[in-house]
A protein has these predicted regions:
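Prokaryotic Sec-type signal peptides and long signal-anchor helices
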Residues: 46, 101-102, 113
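Generic structural signal for hydrophobic core residues of well-folded globular domains
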Residues: 51-52, 98, 120
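Non-catalytic, C-terminal membrane-associated alpha-helical segments of glycosyltransferases
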Residues: 77-85, 107-121
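Conserved nucleotide-sugar donor-binding catalytic segment
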Residues: 1-78
Length: 121
């Protein structure tokens, strides 16, 4: 369990489909005042996995994702200081989410490594 990831594969927002039944419930659970670096797609994925127990990844392409230097994700280059900082905030969001929703959890290896690296940045 020490190595288990608590977050699912998160596709870009344009690739997420949500049933109408869950849409209002999801928006009720989204809180953007806390953890501002955590994007909506990540939050929807976590809510879908842990609250609704429904998270499916289809092996089909319905949209195409294009990366450019102008989009917001370009501020989070892999293993950069910003990337590690946002990853730490994602772990903090997960801990807050689990505690707020009474979901049993344990901190994993990634949590500890991310926090150690952030101490040196």
């Amino acid at each position: 369990y020490f190595y288990k990831s608590y977050w699912p594969f998160i596709p870009p927002q344009s690739c997420i489909a949500v049933s109408r039944n869950h849409l209002n419930d999801i928006f009720d659970l989204l809180d953007f005042d806390l953890f501002p670096k955590i994007w909506m797609d990540f939050r929807i994925g976590i809510i879908s996995k842990y609250i609704f127990n429904e998270f499916k990844v289809l092996n089909k392409s319905y949209t195409y994702y294009r990366q450019s230097n102008e989009n917001i994700s370009s501020n989070y280059k892999f293993l950069s200081k910003n990337w590690w900082n946002r990853r730490k905030e994602a772990h903090e969001y997960i801990m807050y989410f689990f505690k707020s929703n009474n979901i049993d959890h344990k901190k994993n290896f990634d949590y500890y490594i991310t926090n150690i690296i952030n101490k040196f940045l």
